[in-house]
Amino acid sequence: TDVSGSPAIGQDAGLAAGLSENGVIIGDDPRELFEQADVVIDFSSPAASCAHADLAAETGIALVVGTTGLTPEDEAVLEKAGQMAALVYCANTSVGVTLLGQVVEQVAAQLGDSWDIEIVEAHHHHKVDAPSGTALALGEAAANGRNVSFDDVRDSGRDGVTGQRRQGDIGFAVMRGGDVAGEHTVTFFSQQERIELTHRAGSRAIFARGALRAAAFASARKPGMYSMEDVLG
């Protein structure tokens, strides 16, 4: 589906994507989509994702949400929908990023807060939220590794005279430009050494493959909230 008034409405989805015709016509009624689908994949906006979560709850149709920029209130809507339908929610459907998050958590647990953690991310200039959902998820993974609240250690607003870096904080820096599909680097700093963990997306196709894997997983699951870690097993 697309928003009402979009020039894509009525077009074949395959042709609109630059592929061969597949017989799937783009519409603007999400409810009709849910009634005809086994699984719905949603990469849209926070407001649209919440509306789709409500429809998943009403219809019992599995839903994969890869939208970023959701507030805690938005996430609560998804959690509620997960009581009635299988719902996979993740900031990034890439298999590589999912594994990176697991590694970051393990490294953070081993090193402790005497090592400074900084996360740098880069995306295309059309991206509207910052830091990216993936960067924040990596920060949460690091905080989990240290067994601390992410909200207490997140530092993403540096500007001007900020004072000395607070021990234990997890810092963020953002770059926007060109057509970058997504790059994320988590760096652990000590006084005499540095560890860098990086993931670079060469194509958005990796997100599509991961989303399809998540959809296949969700279609065979009972109602509940799931993550890409669950999908990978």
For each of these PLM feature ranges, what is it?
Residues 44:
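Conserved NAD(P)H cofactor-binding loop of Rossmann-fold oxidoreductase domains
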Residues 1-34, 113-233:
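C-terminal substrate-binding/catalytic lobe of Rossmann-fold NAD(P)-dependent oxidoreductases
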Residues 47-59, 65-90, 95-108:
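Rossmann-fold NAD(P)-binding glycine/threonine-rich loop
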Residues 40-41:
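N-terminal Rossmann-like NAD(P) cofactor-binding module of classical short-chain dehydrogenase/reductase
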Residues 37:
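An anion/phosphate-binding loop that grips the pyrophosphate of nucleotide cofactors and donors
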Residues 25-29, 60, 84:
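Hydrophobic/basic alpha-helical segments enriched in Actinobacteria
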